[in-house]
Amino acid sequence: MDPQARPQSSLLTAAPELSPLEQEVLDEYERLSENMKKLAVLLDELASAPATEILDGLRELERKTSLVFTLLKASVYSIVLQQEIDWGGGAGDGH
């Protein structure tokens, strides 16, 4: 890892008794800690949002998911039906 790529706020800035791998692991843990703090803030904001707003968003997501599932089922049915026509009963229909 490039020493200049380390965050300036690092509490353990290149201690001489640490190997480069140990320092890199500590830097990764520090980044993970920062990401967890950001996640906690986002979850707190989400939890403080009105329940009706969250429910409306989930309902919209459910409708979209249902539509995609219906389209997928129709596509699979169409493919299976076409294969049955091509392989079995479709000899006389010009395909």
Curated annotation (Swiss-Prot):
Q: Which UniProt keywords apply?
A: Cell cycle, Cell division, Centromere, Chromosome, Chromosome partition, Cytoplasm, Cytoskeleton, Kinetochore, Microtubule, Mitosis, Nucleus
Does this entry carry the keyword Cell division? yes
Q: Which GO terms describe its molecular function?
A: microtubule plus-end binding
Gene Ontology terms: cellular component? cytoplasm; DASH complex; kinetochore; microtubule; mitotic spindle
Cellular compartments annotated: Chromosome, Centromere, Kinetochore; Cytoplasm, Cytoskeleton, Spindle; Nucleus
Q: What is its main location?
A: nucleus
| Example GO biological process | cell division
**InterPro entries tied to this protein:** DASH_Dad3
Q: How does it assemble?
A: Component of the DASH complex consisting of ASK1, DAD1, DAD2, DAD3, DAD4, DAM1, DUO1, HSK3, SPC19 and SPC34, with a stoichiometry of one copy of each subunit per complex. Multiple DASH complexes oligomerize to form a ring that encircles spindle microtubules and organizes the rod-like NDC80 complexes of the outer kinetochore. DASH complex oligomerization strengthens microtubule attachments. On cytoplasmic microtubules, DASH complexes appear to form patches instead of rings.
Q: Report the PANTHER family cross-referenced here.
A: DASH COMPLEX SUBUNIT DAD3
State the protein's name. Answer: DASH complex subunit DAD3
Write down the species: Chaetomium thermophilum (strain DSM 1495 / CBS 144.50 / IMI 039719)
Instruction: Give the classification, highest ranks.
Output: Eukaryota, Fungi, Dikarya, Ascomycota, Pezizomycotina
